[in-house]
Amino acid sequence: MNRKHVFDQTFFEKVDTEEKAYILGFIYADGCNVKHPTTAELSIAQMERDVDILYKIKDAIKSTYPISERKGDLSGDEKYFVFYIYGKHLGEQLNKLGVTQRKSLTLTFPEFLDDTLMPHFIRGYFDGDGSVWEGKRKKMVVKNDHRPGEYRERIVHNVKFNFTGSSTFIPYLQKYLIEKYGFSETKLNYSKAKDDHRHCTMEYSGRKNLYKLYDIMYSSATIYGERKKAKFEKILCALSEKSLSEMGLIAGTPETVISSEAEKSERSTTIPGMEVGGSLPKCPTLSE
């Protein structure tokens, strides 16, 4: 099999580029490194809606191995695709980078990565085991600070993102986001798995956190999953220009609703890279 197909066997000897960091992050989330008697097998499976990621990995690693279509045993009757690569040296490289044969029991945060590459690693992991969504919006009646005695309606956007993974990985990802990017500490949710290890979910809500994560992951990105980036931008673009102005992220009307001293403090906090002209998605609706 190895004689029929080729790939860049030195790809992971040194993780020193955006592509390598992103793909390593994705493999941390969704890859499987299996040792065989004479070789090793890297396998990555994705549903059809995210198959573009497999082709990007295939191109980056210069592989001639095919991406195979399957159906039935991953998620009901929906089609999915699997990318296999075989190589003993590749397996050894991934093992040294933390992708062991039973990584759900051993996976730890890759502190060996340079900070300049960490956003790409995080984006790769997010494309594998992260989610972003908007729940039902709510209306609140609040005081109008510019017109004493009057009230107005305020739309509360219920936007969230999360990362899921092992209990040996997610807490350290959160620690990095707190120390490097100023995220607050949130409660982590744990659940037991069949193989006696614990799954862990880290969830954040609020527009400010979404903009912050978007900027971290996509401000200089050239490789990413199309679907999740588009979903992220659809949610962000659904926030009106007025909402952005209230957050102090773009020029516009002054902030009109501050419900508490804590909220004042939160809103005055600078978001790295999110000043006026920062890395917001290009939304044609923002100026309407």
Regions found by a protein language model. Give the residues of each.
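Internal intein/HINT superfamily modules and their associated LAGLIDADG
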Residues: M1-E288
